[in-house]
Swiss-Prot record:
It comes from the Bacteria. Belongs to the RNA methyltransferase RlmH family. This is Ribosomal RNA large subunit methyltransferase H. Pfam families: SPOUT_MTase (PF02590). CDD domains: RlmH-like. GO terms for molecular function: rRNA (pseudouridine-N3-)-methyltransferase activity. It comes from Caldicellulosiruptor bescii (strain ATCC BAA-1888 / DSM 6725 / KCTC 15123 / Z-1320) (Anaerocellum thermophilum). Gene3D superfamilies: 3.40.1280.10. S-adenosyl-L-methionine binds at residues 103, 122-127. Keywords: Cytoplasm, Methyltransferase, rRNA processing, S-adenosyl-L-methionine, Transferase. Homodimer. Its main location: cytoplasm.
Amino acid sequence: MIKIISVGTIKEKYFLQACEEYKKRLSRWVKVEEIEIKEEDENKYFNIETLLEKEADKILKHVKEGEFIIVCDINGIELSSEEFSEILRKNINSSKNITFIIGSSNGLSNEVKRRADLLLSFSKLTFPHQLFRVLLYEQIYRGLSIIYGTKYHK
């Protein structure tokens, strides 16, 4: 199973449709669970660290022992699609659930990052949250298409 935990919701219909399309395509190979965490109101907190700690509590209650945790972080390592697919393959073959965590525009707490088995960066560029979720779905689909030998990845 692949679980995607993200802080914030998708508001634009076209981003939502793209995610749903990739979820449908992925369903032939793997079950996908998506968990959206409500973004905290910045105005309620004295500092960002406190806000991130509150979001971390909400995120980590959905993380189970034994899952392979991939935290999406701009300071993580960058992988090729083939390298990414190899990480997916190893964990799928060992029957491990894979959990991806996407933070809010404020990022993620160090507590969440410490739980990661892999800190993964898609780029040094900054992406809108909604678009990034589509990119993540696409790369998961691409990775699995490499594993299962479909013609999607060229």
